[in-house]
């Protein structure tokens, strides 16, 4: 953490709403997203979901008309193959430098002219040719990530996908980068600290972008109630230019790591999940990425993993450069019933009684924010 920087605090927005002023301009300038553009699922890596544009108002909203329509790439595939049944369209479109970027439920991607909706490029790895149905939630995809190189004019689209690969695409042409990983791909089944069952894993959420570091979570199938052993939900970071893995954070501590004693009977050796399946948030000024973690294996019974089970159902602040835990907040000790965090945290600069606080607002399944 940079010297002299104030750490972020997890706060209850419901308790502060009467006397808190929320300030977003500082975060937006930090994120360096031009007005009118949308570079991440929440517009910026702080996940503010705030646009400074003021052209559309309550007075003129009813005058809006459809400018163009785009038919998803997945539609033609589904019409030709009855066995493929995608779920809801969950991708949040990005917009940068005049192009709109979107993914489909089948793991495809497209760049569209923002003014006309005409396709500029498309990307289709045809994962559906060799896969009946991705584990857990089936065919769905939550979106892409945009990265602009501060050392050149290079811009990339990153996509983690159902084929357990991370791909880097040229944002202007859609071409893969042959020097990223292996021919443009990073094999996400490699680099775990222990054995995994790849048949029960998938990737569909946008990766987090922090400077020249790309950080990815995962989806681990959690629908088998008899499951004890399971693949871990470790979070990993990669170099945005080369695809080389920088670090791994064990969401279930291993060996002598902090928190391993919260897994009694050495249950850390075989327990799994505790993954980040949703979105993360990044504060580059503090040098931290914030991980909203899930429930351990299995979701419904914890008799084989006594203890508080860190870092399950927690917000974990991790150093972007080293992958080391800085702090954590565990919402549920010894989690059951799948009460994990269903979305990424929102980073807020707030003022409480004249005191500026860097804060985190986290929506949960636990009836608290």
Predicted regions and their residues:
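Extracytoplasmic/lumenal domain signature
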Residues: 59-75, 109-135, 151, 166-198, ...
